[in-house]
Regions:
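Cytosolic catalytic domains that perform sulfur/thiol-centered chemistry
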Residues: 1-164
């Protein structure tokens, strides 16, 4: 999950989330930044719902809606909470809260990618893209997201471009 939003007390959020995550025996990684949160966590539905409530009720992320999936085994070895100064590890002076594209729901996404004039660009790292990607998407083949601008700068943006 991720949520792009200003979080004034992101350091306190990381402490609160670490405390709650340990109490609920969660695993995975959570990043807290002034521009938002990012993470993938595993645990009981009850424990994960407590995290969602913490983010929505105590930190003003009212629009936060995580994506849920199920696993027969715990996919992570440990629980980590990390503080970062930036949500996106990219150079430059930009504000990801104000300067971002439009989010599309899954129904709209499927309609948009069906258009032959749409380019789908997979900006995830090599490990993630080896697991799978959308048919006919352009895979950036980067080791880290921070390497994406070198790849992305070579694309002519005169068509609709979808990033994931």
């Amino acid at each position: 999950f991720y949520e792009i939003a200003y979080i004034e007390k992101y350091e306190k959020l990381s402490r609160d989330l670490a405390r709650l995550g340990r109490k609920e025996n969660l695993t995975g990684t959570f990043f807290s930044t002034p521009q938002g949160v990012n993470g993938t966590l595993a645990g009981t539905k009850e424990g994960l719902n407590k995290i969602v409530s913490l983010l929505q009720d105590s930190y003003g992320l009212k629009e936060f809606k995580p994506t849920w999936s199920q696993s027969l085994k715990n996919p992570f070895k440990r629980f980590k909470v990390k503080l970062k100064e930036r949500l996106l590890p990219l150079e430059g002076d930009f504000d990801p809260v104000r300067e971002r594209g439009e989010h599309v729901d899954s129904k709209s996404w499927n309609e948009i990618i069906a258009d032959k004039n749409t380019i789908v660009l997979d900006v995830r790292n090599k490990y993630e893209t080896e697991i799978g990607s959308f048919k006919s998407s352009i895979v950036s083949q980067t080791d880290h997201f921070i390497d994406f601008p070198d790849f992305g700068g070579s694309i002519l943006i005169n068509v609709l471009l979808l990033l994931f």
